[in-house]
Amino acid sequence: MSDPISLFTRWRTTSASQWGELEIQKDASMVRKGRQSFRGIICSSTRSVAAVVIAWQLMSGLASAIDIEDMRWGFNGKVALNRFNILSVLVRNPTPQPFDGEMRLVKKLGGAATVDARIVEPVSLAPFSSKWVQFYPYVNGAWGNSVGNETWWLQYGRGETVEVPQPRVAKYQRVILDDSSGLGPRGGVLRRMPENLFPSFISATDGLQVVALDREPRTWIPTQKECFLEWIDLGGTVVLLHGSSGKFPDFSGPLAVLNSPLDDRRYGAGRVMKVGMQRAQFNEDEARQAFVSLPKNHLQPNEKPEDPIDYVDPTEQNQANPNAYGEGADPFSASSFMGQLKEMTKPEHNWILLHFMFWVYIAMVFPGCYLLGKRWSDFRVVYAGLLGTVVLFSFLFSIVGQRGYGEATAVHSVAIAKALPDGGLDVAAWSNVFVTNGAYYTIKHNGRGALYSTCNESEQVNGEINNGADGSFRVDIPPFSNREFATRIKLPAGSPKIKVDSFKLTEARLAELELSIDGVKQEDTQFVNALFGDRFYTLHWQNGKLKLAGDAGDAASMLKVQNMQNWSRNQYGYGYDYQREGQTVKDRFNLMYTPLLSRSLNVARESEARQVRLPPDLVRVFLYAKMPAEFAVQSTSLGGHNGEVLYCVDVPLPVQ
């Protein structure tokens, strides 16, 4: 029998051994479980990463899963320079998944650097479907009536980029509307345009001159019909041809106003004519005869016309204007107006105070800091003094500089506003915004069919444009800088109401004219003219009415297009005009009156001025007046608005 001490020692040893084995077994079990758990985590993570990669690939595929099947410029494949134009893009979704994304249209200079702001259009496509997406870019004109060095690119999906074909140029475009299915009859001299591509707002019809119809458009929505009638009222020409039944089309709804027994009649400033033949018979000779009174495009050197009826014969062109070299560029482009507006925001600094502050600043830096160091013999004091001087004078220069700009943002604008039958206004405007605080600004107007562009040819603009029915322009403007932009829009109201009280003609010229006017005040008016036939007349205010004051000559004499080639620049045609250094804001607004007249009549050449002629039953009144609040940018952060607007109102003359 062992002693108690030996038994106790053996028990401790045995217990410790068993406990150790137990701990080792537990540790081994935990290691096995940990390995299994780690392998599970690894597998789970791998599956998650794989799922994310697959989802990303699917999303990338979906985001890119659209094909561009067709691209069309303008109404007949061409563009009007220095105007907003339509770019129609046919997009298809070939996948079983719906597509929701956006497409971006960007402009590049020579295919390299991006300039101007990007134009963005949202796109939604059902599986295996297609649709037309329309952009409304502003196309600048270069010397010689060409597109110049700018190119356009479409961006979509995740990095997909497609170059848009370079457009041909046609200031006046003529088309015949086709069934949107493309299954209609063919033939004839006019370019075909699918009816569903016709715009829904008047602001997008720049460049359209003639529309031929041999059937009623079946797919038009009410806004397209409204736009079409407004376009005619402002001067468009409609040609009605025989359809497949051998008869003229019979229109219904709002378009029923086109039904008439007359073969040639007026609709506002526009014209509706009937030509008793089908489209295949409407050849070049018939078209030239029908359009003999309409302005035509000028053929450029070494250019072969695709559509002969659109162009002036080169021989006729040279005879009409032997000095055509002087008409190489449009003198009334957006840049000419925006350049004048930009000059209106000029700082009026207190230069005496600024110079005094400058020399004080120099003296405090040296020898001020040097003397400070000798006095205290401590580099920390010198550094503190230098830093304090820089901070103090930075603040002071900022305050004095802001006072030079009036310490406020400013918007200056000019506009052309053409009266519409419903009391609305078809507006083309140019604006310059100056801001003292840098930020993103949203530019928006209270109207429909707003189109925006900076018209920039050399600078990339950090902004995004959404054109269309509810258009807007969001742009980053640095502090103490300008942003110019052009706008086309329809305002719902604001047209002056003018009525003829009396008039008298002598040898087809106005001898007397008295007009009642409502909507424009005498004190807000700068200039008033009237156009009757091919002649301008001066009007003046008398007892709250407008009365004839004198004959201002024919359109060519009034507009002086050849003399206005460099109106917005110096006498050499480039650079800054120092002769206008002292001009006031009012002086610059007055300077733009005649160019705005030319622009409103779509005149950029002497030969075009000689073709200006209104129907004999209309007088067009031009009022250059203070811009009302309805034209202003709808933004409280952009401060005051100052501008002038040229109202163009067609007034029917009573039948004598």
Give the label of every model feature segment.
Residues G401-D422:
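Alpha-helical transmembrane signal-anchor/signal-peptide segments
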Residues R380-R403:
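Internal/C-terminal transmembrane anchor helices
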Residues M193, G207-L208, T237, G253-P367:
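A glycine-centered loop/beta-turn motif at secondary-structure junctions
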Residues D206-P249, A269-V275:
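Short alpha-beta junction capping motif
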Residues P347, V427-Q656:
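Accessory, solvent-exposed terminal regions and/or long lumenal/extracellular loops of proteins
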Residues I86-P94, E514-D518:
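Short edge beta-strand/loop segments characteristic of extracellular beta-sandwich folds
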Residues R83, V139-V210, R265, G270, ...:
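Aromatic-Pro/Gly-enriched surface loop or interdomain linker
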Residues V106-W143, T538-N570:
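Intrinsically disordered, low-complexity Pro/Gly/Ser/Thr-rich segments with frequent PxxP/GP/PP motifs
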